[in-house]
């Protein structure tokens, strides 16, 4: 499948600092955030005009699920648009607090762990053909996902009883299973719950919940692009060396704690391989595969960055990728800070900096400041992100959903939507079922809109 439907779901961390005597719990802060949403959507679980879903998840975490995208730059742009949507809610909520005499600054973090050790996720969704053997996909994909922290981890300072240590991944410490149907209780790497949000006879949806939330656009593109390419190669019958892991959960932690990528990881049957060895195998197959695949500039950019990052890890010289990979950008920032102020990695100020890197408020968040200074590369533009806040992807089913929502809201009509249904809540209860996520034009939807 060379054209693939993809999406990213991001849960955001919430905290608030108060200036007066009045204090609010995280639950109350989250409700303030969603008050504007509830006022027009009558719910804290809504679909937006850009086709995305916005809702309050368990544990007061706002969650933004992008609309269906069929290209990498489109997905990166819509992922960033989610940050803007949440930032707008943040500004509105702070104003509401002020109007009620509650002085406070709300913070939304696009990260994966809070100071209490709770974890929340960034989930990737990939449409795959039903005909394939799912166990083969998960067998080949699992070693890739366990070791891809080397190329797309967000980086984290982990405080251990002995010392503070810099790790590749925020999520690695919180994953407890390889493949499972649960998402919260056991936190697997691949979630097998079969909800295709499409024609179930043709497709299923691969739900990957092991990834870090990335601030860097180029890292997001590499994370999703490399996984999508590996899926495409599996579907095309490309043969990979067997890197079945003896214990994926132990391996994911070992890989996260080794910035050199050289630490041996135990494979099934007693063999060993390093994270770098494993990533090199997938990368080599990708380079070969591109020779036979029809040209695609975005995929070529992904493979180029993949190779440069593996070279950087191998040589431990990160100069050629230090604006493109989250954990590399973050580590360089910490090192400069430590050198300037002569401080240890365990200093609380470094932990504050770690958190501030993921603050999504422009002008305050550290990543935003790095980006403005040219220290973090761009894939998209501010104008494209602003457009994506209100406009759905034009090449997928999201276009139908977005146009239906816009028309219904402007006509003042009551409606219900989900990923596959568009329904007018009138006497006729007219409903259109959109089972094909690739389809952006549908006469039935046009008629439904025209009838408003």
UniProtKB/Swiss-Prot annotation:
Residues annotated to bind Mg(2+): 9, 55, 63
EC annotation from Swiss-Prot or TrEMBL: 6.3.1.19
Top-level taxon in the UniProt lineage: Bacteria
Binding positions (ATP): 53, 66, 419
Pathway listed: Protein degradation; proteasomal Pup-dependent pathway; Protein modification; protein pupylation
GO biological process: modification-dependent protein catabolic process; proteasomal protein catabolic process; protein pupylation
Active site: 57
Catalytic activity line of the entry: ATP + [prokaryotic ubiquitin-like protein]-L-glutamate + [protein]-L-lysine = ADP + phosphate + N(6)-([prokaryotic ubiquitin-like protein]-gamma-L-glutamyl)-[protein]-L-lysine
GO molecular function, one term: ATP binding
Keyword Signal recorded: no
Enzyme class: ligase
Keyword terms, alphabetized: ATP-binding, Ligase, Magnesium, Metal-binding, Nucleotide-binding, Ubl conjugation pathway
UniProt record similarity statement: Belongs to the Pup ligase/Pup deamidase family. Pup-conjugating enzyme subfamily.
Additional note from the record: The reaction mechanism probably proceeds via the activation of Pup by phosphorylation of its C-terminal glutamate, which is then subject to nucleophilic attack by the substrate lysine, resulting in an isopeptide bond and the release of phosphate as a good leaving group.
Function: Catalyzes the covalent attachment of the prokaryotic ubiquitin-like protein modifier Pup to the proteasomal substrate proteins, thereby targeting them for proteasomal degradation. This tagging system is termed pupylation. The ligation reaction involves the side-chain carboxylate of the C-terminal glutamate of Pup and the side-chain amino group of a substrate lysine.
Protein name stated in the entry: Pup--protein ligase
Organism: Mycolicibacterium vanbaalenii (strain DSM 7251 / JCM 13017 / BCRC 16820 / KCTC 9966 / NRRL B-24157 / PYR-1) (Mycobacterium vanbaalenii)
């Amino acid at each position: 499948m060379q054209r693939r439907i993809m999406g990213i779901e991001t849960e955001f961390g919430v905290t608030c600092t108060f200036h007066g005597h009045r204090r609010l719990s995280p639950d109350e802060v989250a409700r303030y955030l969603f008050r504007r949403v509830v006022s027009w959507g009558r719910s804290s679980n809504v679909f937006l005009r850009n086709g995305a879903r916005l809702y309050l998840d368990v544990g007061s975490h706002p969650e933004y699920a992008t609309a269906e995208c069929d290209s990498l730059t489109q997905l990166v742009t819509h992922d960033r648009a989610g940050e803007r949507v949440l930032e707008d809610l943040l500004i509105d909520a702070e104003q509401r607090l002020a109007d009620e005499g509650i002085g406070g600054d709300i913070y939304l973090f696009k990260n994966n762990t809070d100071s209490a050790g709770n974890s929340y996720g960034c989930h990737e969704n990939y449409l795959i053909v039903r005909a394939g053997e799912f166990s083969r996909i998960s067998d080949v994909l699992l070693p890739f996902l366990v070791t891809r922290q080397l190329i797309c981890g967000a980086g984290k300072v982990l405080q251990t009883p002995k010392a503070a240590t810099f790790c590749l991944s925020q999520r690695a410490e919180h994953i407890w299973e390889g493949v499972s149907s649960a998402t919260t209780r056991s936190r697997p790497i691949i979630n097998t719950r079969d909800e295709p949000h499409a024609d179930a006879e043709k497709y299923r949806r691969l739900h990957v919940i092991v990834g870090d939330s990335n601030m860097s656009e180029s890292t997001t593109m590499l994370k999703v692009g490399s996984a999508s390419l590996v899926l495409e190669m599996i579907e095309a019958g490309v043969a990979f060396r067997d890197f079945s892991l003896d214990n994926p959960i132990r391996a994911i932690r070992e890989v996260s704690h080794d910035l050199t990528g050289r630490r041996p990881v135990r494979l099934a049957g007693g063999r060993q391989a390093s994270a770098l060895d494993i990533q090199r195998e997938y990368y080599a197959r990708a380079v070969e595969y591109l020779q036979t695949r029809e040209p695609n500039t975005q995929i070529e950019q992904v493979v180029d960055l993949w190779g440069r990052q593996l070279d950087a890890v191998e040589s431990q010289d990160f100069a050629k990728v230090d604006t493109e990979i989250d954990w590399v950008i973050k580590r360089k920032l910490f090192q400069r800070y430590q050198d300037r102020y002569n401080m240890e990695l365990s200093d609380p100020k470094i932990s504050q900096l770690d958190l501030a890197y993921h603050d999504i408020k422009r002008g305050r968040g550290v990543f935003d400041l790095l980006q403005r200074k040219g220290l973090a590369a761009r894939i998209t533009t501010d104008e494209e992100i602003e457009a994506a806040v209100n406009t759905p992807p034009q090449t997928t089913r999201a276009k139908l959903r977005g146009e239906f929502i816009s028309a219904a809201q402007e006509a003042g009509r009551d409606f219900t939507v989900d990923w596959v249904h568009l329904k007018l809540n009138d006497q006729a209860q007219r409903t259109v079922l959109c089972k094909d996520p690739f389809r952006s034009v549908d006469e039935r939807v046009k008629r439904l809109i025209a009838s408003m």
